[in-house]
Amino acid sequence: MGSARANVWRVAEKNVDLVRPQIEARPFALDAQPQALRVDAARSAFIVVDMQNDFCAKGGFLDYRGVDITPDRKPIEPIAAIVPKVRAASVPIVWLNWGVRPDLLNASPSLLHAHAPEGTGAGLGQRIPGGAPILVEGSWGAQIVDELVPDPSDIRVTKYRYSGFWDTELDSILRNLGCTTLFFAGVNADQCVMTTLQDAMFLGYDCVMVEDCVGTTSPDYCMLATLYNVKLLFGFVTQSPAIERGLNEAKLGG
């Protein structure tokens, strides 16, 4: 009885076995900073944050605001390359995207102000002139960019704060899956990726940022500070080719 193989009971008419099944470790070596790692693929998940139209596509929210979205599009190619390889190793893929309610009842004034600081122009939940409502769940802007195609087996989680752990089911899902190590990809590295990674670390997860699979439209020093702080305080930094190499050497995946 249970929704995930790592967290089930065995139930009969007169007794219940609460002993969870042992999940066989599937370790692989991973080049990372500040130290090399040994990671258990059986207890890992790969989280892709906010690779959605409002941040990464022409006609989306950032493009409407005049932001150069080139840095947010840069991770698309490496994410598209590594996700199938990670999936083939039976590592869960989690697509974590912004999506506020259309009535904005899950958005506070402080959150609304951050997206329209002068109170003018389109902000959260409002419609871009000639376009879709901004970051509304189910809207075009909340959809994953066309270049990244989730598999039906992948997991989707909607968030409405910068951190994907705040008031969402993400932590429950990961604990049901038995995950202890989380890989992070997506945008913006210094904002939603970083706050999600920080909350994960505070909750006791092992955190690995995949450097070539994250991007930000912030100034370069913001990315440098993000990588510095991840390595100093919150976890580790690796590259997607290192993940692929480690999985291949351990003969994990297809």
Question: What residues fall within each predicted segment?
Answer:
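Active-site-adjacent betaalpha module
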Residues: 1-45, 54, 72, 81-89, ...
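A short alpha/beta connector and helix-capping loop motif
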Residues: 42, 59-86, 91-97
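Short beta-strand "acidic-cap" motif of Rossmann-like dinucleotide-binding folds
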Residues: 48, 95, 209
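Active-site loop/turn elements of alpha/beta-hydrolase fold enzymes
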Residues: 51, 98, 212
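Short acidic, Gly/Ser-rich segments with clustered Asp/Glu that frequently serve as metal-coordination loops
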Residues: 52-58
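Short, well-ordered beta-to-alpha junction loops that form the rim of enzyme active sites
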Residues: 96-99, 187
